[in-house]
Design a protein with these regions (language model features):
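A cross-family "folded-core" feature that marks the main globular domain of proteins
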Residues: 1-166
Length: 166
């Protein structure tokens, strides 16, 4: 077992890290739902949420309790999740929670096309970073958290629609 795998497994067992991940998916309406999902007592869940909340507040991220979700600067939230998944996982495919094969293929193809259209360096690190960021962005968008239009100014291009539909 590699040290990276040991570290990733340790993080995955941490209640605080499990809570942070659950907050991305926004599937728990309240503390009781979250505690049941993670097999923690409601009081331990609440203590962990308070601990997480105090750290998040320093970055301008707020924890909403009903429903449980993170709000604040969208770029900071997405970057936090990127850093979280980098620490948690040593393999890209272990990231994709509850995704079907065709969805994983779609993300992979979008990454491929994005690299090609923008003439980016095509290596494992670039693919991993883009894959993680697309996965996180899709979940955030699914839950109604959009990137502010004014912050979307970039020279990067998206692949043509017909290429994506193929």
């Amino acid at each position: 077992v590699s040290i990276n795998r040991l570290y990733a497994d340790t993080i995955q067992q941490s209640p605080e890290f499990q809570i942070i991940e659950e907050l991305l998916y926004e599937e728990c309406e309240n503390i009781i739902d979250l505690s049941k999902k993670l097999f923690l007592s409601p009081s331990k869940t609440q203590r962990n949420l308070k601990k997480i909340e105090s750290v998040l507040l320093k970055t301008g991220i707020t924890l909403q309790y009903r429903p449980l979700r993170l709000e604040g600067n969208e770029s900071v939230i997405r970057h936090m999740y990127y850093r979280y998944f980098i620490e948690k996982s040593d393999r890209l495919d272990s990231l994709y929670r509850d995704l079907k094969e065709f969805q994983i293929k779609a993300i992979t193809e979008l990454v491929n096309q994005f690299i090609q259209v923008n003439k980016l360096e095509d290596n494992y690190i670039s693919r991993k970073r883009l894959g993680y960021n697309m996965y996180i962005s899709l979940w955030r968008i699914k839950n109604g958290h959009y990137y502010p239009t004014l912050e979307l100014d970039s020279d990067l291009m998206l692949p043509e629609r017909q290429i994506l539909d193929a």
